[in-house]
Each structure stands twice: as C-alpha cells, then as structure tokens.
Amino acid sequence: MAKADTKTKSSTSTQKRTTKAKKDPDAPKRPLSAYMFFSQDQRERVKNANPEAGFGEVGRLLGAKWKEMSEAEKKPYNDMANRDKARAEAEKAAYNKRR
C-alpha cells in the first residue's frame, strides 16, 4: 500500500513575520508578586539545604513550600507585593504623563 502524500506547506514560510516592538528602557518595572518576594527571600536557603538540586528542582521545592504556608505566614510577602504594586502604578502614571 502506497503512502499518501504528506507534504504540506508551512504557514510560516508564506506569512510575513511581524517585528517585536522594542521595549522602552525608561518604562517602569512590573510589580513583583508575593510569591516572587518569597522566592527571592528563600531561594538561597533552599539551595543550601539541597545543594544537589538544580534550578528547576529548587523552583519546585519553593512552590511546594509556598503552598504549605498559611495566610498568616504569607502576609509579609503579600504586604511587600501590595507596596510594590502601588510603586509600579505610581511610576506607570508618571511615565504615561511624560509620554
């Protein structure tokens, strides 16, 4: 039995590529989440406790630790995230006024 012709044209070869807009270096930084503040705070401790763990494994350990935490334990990180969100919104408003 002969195989059917499976050759198809790639849609990417016929479509025009769009260029990604360059990011303004003066644009304000996005706010960090509570988990990201936790991750920054705990990453070295987790790496020291698990020296054989790679980058992905450390991330999984941090995620598991974050899920185990109570809301009271997460509160300092949530407060940091709220402050950072307010900072980012203020910087964005000032940035948009300049533009």
UniProtKB/Swiss-Prot annotation:
The keyword Nucleus applies. It is found in: Nucleus; Chromosome. It comes from Mycosarcoma maydis. The keyword Nucleus applies. GO terms for biological process: DNA repair. Keywords: Chromosome, DNA damage, DNA repair, DNA-binding, Nucleus, Transcription, Transcription regulation. One of its GO terms (molecular function) is DNA binding. Belongs to the NHP6 family. Residues 1-32, 71-99 are annotated as: Disordered. This is Non-histone chromosomal protein 6. GO terms for cellular component: chromosome; nucleus. InterPro entries: HMG_box_dom, HMG_box_dom_sf, HMGB. Pfam families: HMG_box. DNA-binding protein that induces severe bending of DNA. Required for DNA-binding by the FACT complex, a general chromatin factor that acts to reorganize nucleosomes. The FACT complex is involved in multiple processes that require DNA as a template such as mRNA elongation, DNA replication and DNA repair. Also augments the fidelity of transcription by RNA polymerase III independently of any role in the FACT complex. Its main location: nucleus. SMART domains: HMG. Weakly associates with the stable SPT16-POB3 heterodimer to form the FACT complex.
